[in-house]
Amino acid sequence: MSIQLPRGTQDILPDDAAIWQYIEQVAKETCETYHYQEIRTPIFEHTEIFSRGVGDTTDIVQKEMYTFSDRGGRSLTLRPEGTAAVVRSYVNHKLYASPAQPTKLYYTGPMFRYERPQAGRMRQFVQFGVEALGSASPQLDAEVLALLIAICKKLGLVNLKLVINSLGDSESRQAHREALIAHFKPSIDEFCSDCQMRLEKNPLRILDCKKDREHPLMATAPSILDYLNEESRAYFQSLKETLDLLNIPYVVDPTLVRGLDYYNHTAFELLSTAPGFGAITTLCGGGRYNGLVQEFGGPETPGIGFAFSIERFILAMKAENVDLPVPQSLDAYVVTLGDEASRLGPQLLQRLRDGGIRADKDYLGKKMKAQLKAADRYQASYTIIIGEDEIAKQQALVKQMATGEQTVVAISDLTSFLQEQIRGGN
C-alpha cells in the first residue's frame, strides 16, 4: 500500500509549478515597483504570537491552528497567516527605528489551517502578502489597494469587485461594541455556542459567523458606519476620495468585518465575479492594524496589509480563461552516436549550459531514433547531433526542429552560434 498525501495538502508537479512561479514573480516584481522589499519569517512561531496577534476569539486560533509542544515544552504553531509573524519580526529587529519610513514589506510562503478542504481552500496553502508599517495615512491604504489591483491586472484578472469598510478607531469600535451587545444579548440563546462566547469578548465576531448568518438579527445589526466618530469618518472619506482619483472602483459594505481581531479603520476584500469561479469568491483580504506593533512590545505604530492565496488566484485565472504559462522548453538537445561522442557529451552539454542555454541529453543509452524522439518530446528548439565523424572533424550537426533546416557548426563555435540563433528568434 502506497503512502498517500495528508488530507488538505497537494503536490505541485513540474507542469503546474510554472504557473505558481509566474504568479509569484509577477507579484514580486509589482511590489518592487511600489518600493516594497521581501521579508522571510519562520514557518512556525511561538503560539502566543497568533493568540495575541490574530485574536483568541477567532476561528483561526480556536479551531484551525496546528499547534504542538517541542521537546523543551514550548508551545509552537505552524503559521496560519503572515501578518503577525511579520510584525513580530518588525519589532524584534527594531525596524521602526529606521529613518526610512514607512517600512514596506512583502512575503510569500506556506501557511497552515485545519479547515475542511475544498477547491481554493487547503490545509497547507501558499500565501502572498504585503505589509506597510509606519504611516497612518489613508493614502497609504489606497496605495496598498492599488498595488493589489495592479498585480491582478498583470495576471489577466479583470472580473473583480473591491469591497471596503471602516471599522473605525478604538472610540468608534467601543460605541459599536456596546450597540452590538444590546442588539444581540436578548436573543443570544438562539445563536451558536461560539457567538454566545463572543458576545462579551468581541461581539463584532458575531457578524462573521458562518453558522448563524441567516438569523434575522444579523440583517438588522447596528452598522459600524453609524458609530464612526468625526476622525474615523474623515479617514474613511479620504480613502474613498483617493481611490476615486486612482480610478479604482469599490463598493462599501458595512457588514464586512474580516476574520481577524487586529483590524481597525480600513478593512477590505477583493472578490472574483468570474462565472464558474466557485462558491468561495474571496480572492484577497486585508486591512489596517494600528495597534498590533504595540501589542508585540513595540512603539505605537500603524500598519496596513493584505494577503492572498495563490491557489485561489490560479482558480480565478482558469475561470477567466487566462493563458497560463507552461514549463520552459529546451533550447537544445544533444544526441550522441558512438562511444567517443557519448564520452564527450557531458563536456559539450556543460559548455552550452555555461553559456545560458537550456540543454539536456540522453542518460539511458538510447538509440539515435529514440534520442530524436526525446528531443521532440521535450520541445527542444534545436537538436545537436554528434557522431564519430563529427568528433573527428570537431563539428556538430545542428537541426532546427521547427523547420528541419540543418547546419554544420564547429564545436568551438557551437555555444555562440546557438546564443545568436536564440536571441534572434530563429
UniProtKB/Swiss-Prot annotation:
Homodimer. Its main location: cytoplasm. GO terms for cellular component: cytoplasm. GO terms for biological process: histidyl-tRNA aminoacylation. This is Histidine--tRNA ligase 1. The gene is hisS1. Its EC number is 6.1.1.21. The keyword Transferase does not apply. PANTHER family: HISTIDINE--TRNA LIGASE, MITOCHONDRIAL-RELATED (PTHR43707:SF1), HISTIDYL-TRNA SYNTHETASE (PTHR43707). The keyword ATP-binding applies. GO terms for molecular function: ATP binding; catalytic activity, acting on a protein; histidine-tRNA ligase activity; transferase activity. It comes from Shouchella clausii (strain KSM-K16) (Alkalihalobacillus clausii).
